[in-house]
């Protein structure tokens, strides 16, 4: 197996809401990513930890919201998260609760009947709709600006021939998808990213799909065709990832040669980030320590078959010398 790690770049596009100052936010994400890798393959975790420059954060949130939050708000909860080795019975029970199942049903109905969205009881859902509309309708040019924040490092990496893992969490997966579409169909950049990894993604929602760049087209411009592989991870209890089966919505990308594979991982996926409000199955920190996410990152880093690299039973392939 060839060691290509010197050209590996991990680009992370966060989800909505104000984030900590970029350096502090990056440190928190990096901590969680490495912890997830430690749990599936300590050797790979050590190798990646020795190359911190490989991890690039796209800090679009201050551009969009005009403010930042304090890193101290999340720090103790992230430390608690990283001291665990997986979800416990309470995490699983809460993720599978009838309350979550009922909320999911209501959101599915509203996704097909958008006029019902203002009637939903969860204010977080309403705010998410308002914020996504600001992005989709490019109010004050902000949509184009946040896509440019993603495209700028991607252009440089693609030109350098780097292997790119593009991770999009939540609304960040929408921005990443649209940025790839523009690189392909507007800028006509012929290069491809190696892996798109979407976490807690709303791309399965009809409301979102109707507003994606190119999605309504029925010609060769409908999808970005610069993604070698796509892995989507969706956790139980994450209501933002309303439909976890993205292959059913984007399967035409396979037929059109736009990507080599689309894999949905949602069976037995339980994130376990908690704060003072209880379990939050959607937070990016929880996804980064989760085993399905970590195995995808580890296998990509090595350019290896995932079953050989870091199988679920914990045995692992030795790092190349």
What residue spans do the PLM features occupy?
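Lipid deacylating catalytic domains
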Residues: 1-60, 65-69, 107-167, 173-321
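N-terminal accessory regions of S-adenosyl-L-methionine
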Residues: 60-62, 67-94
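Low-complexity, serine/threonine/proline-enriched polar segments
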Residues: 81-116
């Amino acid at each position: 197996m060839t060691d290509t790690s010197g050209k590996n770049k991990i680009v992370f596009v966060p989800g909505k809401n104000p984030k900590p100052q970029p350096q502090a936010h990056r440190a928190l994400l990096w901590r969680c990513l490495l912890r997830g890798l430690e749990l599936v393959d300590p050797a790979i975790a050590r190798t990646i930890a020795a190359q911190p420059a490989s991890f690039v954060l796209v800090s679009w949130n201050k551009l969009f919201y005009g403010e930042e939050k304090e890193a101290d708000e999340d720090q103790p909860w992230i430390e608690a998260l990283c001291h665990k080795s997986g979800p416990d019975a309470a995490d699983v029970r809460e993720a599978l609760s009838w309350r979550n199942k009922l909320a999911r049903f209501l959101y599915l109905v509203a996704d097909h009947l958008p006029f019902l969205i203002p009637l939903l009881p969860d204010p977080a859902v309403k705010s998410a709709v308002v914020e996504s509309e600001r992005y989709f309708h490019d109010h004050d040019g902000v949509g184009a600006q946040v896509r440019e924040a993603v495209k700028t490092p991607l252009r440089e990496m693609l030109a350098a021939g780097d292997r790119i893992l593009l991770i999009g969490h939540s609304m960040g997966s929408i921005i990443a998808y649209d940025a790839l579409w523009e690189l392909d169909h507007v800028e006509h950049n012929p290069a491809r990213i190696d892996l798109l990894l979407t976490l807690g993604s709303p791309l399965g929602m009809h409301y979102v799909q109707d507003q994606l760049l190119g999605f309504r087209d029925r010609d060769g411009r409908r999808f970005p065709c610069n993604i070698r592989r796509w892995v989507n991870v969706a956790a139980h209890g994450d209501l933002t990832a309303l439909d976890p089966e993205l292959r059913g919505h984007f399967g035409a990308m396979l037929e059109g040669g736009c990507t080599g594979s689309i894999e949905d991982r949602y069976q037995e996926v339980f994130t376990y980030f908690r704060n003072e409000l209880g379990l939050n199955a959607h937070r990016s920190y929880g996804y980064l320590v989760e085993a399905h996410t970590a195995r995808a990152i580890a296998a990509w880093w090595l350019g290896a078959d995932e079953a050989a690299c870091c199988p679920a039973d914990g045995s692992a392939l030795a790092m190349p010398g």
